[in-house]
Amino acid sequence: MKIDVQKITSQQDGLELEVAVVKPQSPAVGVVVFSHGMAEHKERYFDFIKYLSQHGFACVIHDHRGHGQSVKSESDLGYFYTQNINCIVDDLHQVVGFAKSLFPNLPIMLFSHSMGTLVSRCYLKKYDGEIDKLVLCGPPTENKMAGLAICIAHLSQLFHGKKHANKMLNKLTFGSYNKGLEAENAWICANEETVKKYNEDKLCGFIFTTNGFINLFKLMKQAFNKKGWSVAHADLPIYVIAGEEDPVIQNQKAFDGLVKFLRDRGYNDINSKLYAGMRHELLNEIDNAKVYSDVLKFLVK
């Protein structure tokens, strides 16, 4: 698989964003744009991208600001350079436009994971007419404490600064996720090898800065704000998937609540699935072949 790595300049603030492009060997049947999760990077999706390219899909994935190579220095991991969430959302909008320029007249599919689903849902509110299908994988469900969390984060920023790696907010947000599990970050995946690689990767699992947490909480609040949905593409096919043992979805009731929230906004073509025995990173589970196949079926139907 040939990977073309490029830099594009964010139209929001001039930050350099690193983008990887993969073309299939046969004529492309569609384009999959990715929106990755928190405290990880684009390279973790290359196995799935290889699978999609073998089935005729071109793929475009960038490192979100504050992640991977979309930082000014390694010390900026978890720092977004702004507290305006429109920047990370419109970065995605720009990458979708970039993908369209590379592969004109092809359907655009958006695959998003975890925090990336918050970005894609905020993107959806403004730009749903730009894409042809949407996958939400491991999506955070509604947390009604998001507003309070923003206030706490701003207060913490007054004392510690915006670039402070905020262990307190990290514990408040994720402290319960690993309950009952032995290995560090075992909540992300039942596949022990995946967890081991994640823990050994310096571009994964870093603690967000206070600025990063403010952005995260704002994304959560905006994604579940009932106001501001244009719904220009009401019949957009949406596929919502998660592991039954994923703490990010909280529970099945909250997961079903997310699906209902999108239906209530006006989207009428939503399917969902929970995978038994799987945790947060469906693409990296031992039985990921089933997930790969299900997503592919959704993309091609």
Question: What residue ranges belong to the model's regions?
Answer:
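Alpha/beta-hydrolase active-site loop
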Residues: 80-100
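Alpha/beta-hydrolase fold nucleophile elbow
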Residues: 103-114
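Short beta-strand/loop motif that positions the catalytic acidic residue
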Residues: 240-242
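Conserved alpha/beta-hydrolase
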Residues: 44, 49-75
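Alpha/beta-hydrolase-fold enzymes
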Residues: 120-203
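Catalytic active-site module of serine/aspartate enzymes centered on a nucleophile-bearing elbow/loop
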Residues: 263-301
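Active-site glycine-rich loops that stabilize anionic/oxyanionic intermediates
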Residues: 36-40, 115, 244-245
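N-terminal cap/lid segment of alpha/beta-hydrolase-fold proteins
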Residues: 1-24
